[in-house]
Amino acid sequence: MAIKSRIRTIPDYPKKGIMFRDITTLLKDPVGFRLVIDQLSQHYIENGVDFDMIVGMEARGFIIGGALSYTLGKGFVPIRKPGKLPGEVVDQEYQLEYGTDKVEMHIDALEKGSRVLLVDDLLATGGTAMAGASLVEKVGGVIAEMAFIVNLPDIGGQKKLEEKGYKLFCLTEFEGE
């Protein structure tokens, strides 16, 4: 059974007309979760993508990024919602469908020039990933690649990120569905 088949689709959530891709069904399935981590690990081992640190977006990026950090022997840095990190932070505001949000990272989380794998569960508009990349770059890091379980290419995030020069790796996608 493939990764895609383990992801539940919830129609009309969080609002009418949206097909919500719920990865919690994938994460609770021990074989499915192992497939995710094994396939991501294999990609980075086989393709020799050079990076020093894994940065995960709150909240599901923590789950994937933490497991991937363990399997690949890399450190892990969380990007969090405002007010969740003690100490000095940098922040980045980004656009939501109706308004804005903000994410934060410790100012000393990365050494200057660190190459980073940015990890999140799903790529839709690209706003969260762009905010994460901006934080990494603000503290002197470089995005080596971005990894996602799911890509929703029709929403435009993939195109936006690639136009900015970011390399992406996605395990599966839901196109026009």
UniProtKB/Swiss-Prot annotation:
Q: What does this protein do?
A: Catalyzes a salvage reaction resulting in the formation of AMP, that is energically less costly than de novo synthesis.
Catalysis: reaction(s): AMP + diphosphate = 5-phospho-alpha-D-ribose 1-diphosphate + adenine
The metabolic or biological pathway listed in the UniProt record of this protein is: Purine metabolism; AMP biosynthesis via salvage pathway; AMP from adenine: step 1/1
Sections of the chain in a coiled coil: none
Q: Please classify the protein's predominant subcellular localization into one broad category.
A: cytoplasm
Which one GO biological process term can you cite for this protein? AMP salvage
Record InterPro entries: Ade_phspho_trans (IPR005764), PRibTrfase_dom (IPR000836), PRTase-like (IPR029057), UPRTase/APRTase (IPR050054)
Q: Which NCBIfam families match?
A: apt, PRK02304.1-3, PRK02304.1-5
GO terms for molecular function, please? Answer: adenine binding; adenine phosphoribosyltransferase activity; AMP binding
Q: Which HAMAP family does its entry note?
A: Aden_phosphoribosyltr (MF_00004)
Q: What is this protein called?
A: Adenine phosphoribosyltransferase
Organism, per UniProt? Chlorobium phaeobacteroides (strain BS1)
Tell me the superkingdom of the source: Bacteria
> Keyword annotations for this protein?
Cytoplasm, Glycosyltransferase, Purine salvage, Transferase
Into which family does the record put it? Belongs to the purine/pyrimidine phosphoribosyltransferase family.
Report the top EC class in one word.
transferase
Q: Which GO terms describe its cellular component?
A: cytoplasm
Provide the assembly information.
Homodimer.
Name of the gene: apt
Tell me where in or outside the cell this protein is found: Cytoplasm
Q: What is its EC number?
A: 2.4.2.7
Gene3D superfamilies according to UniProt: 3.40.50.2020
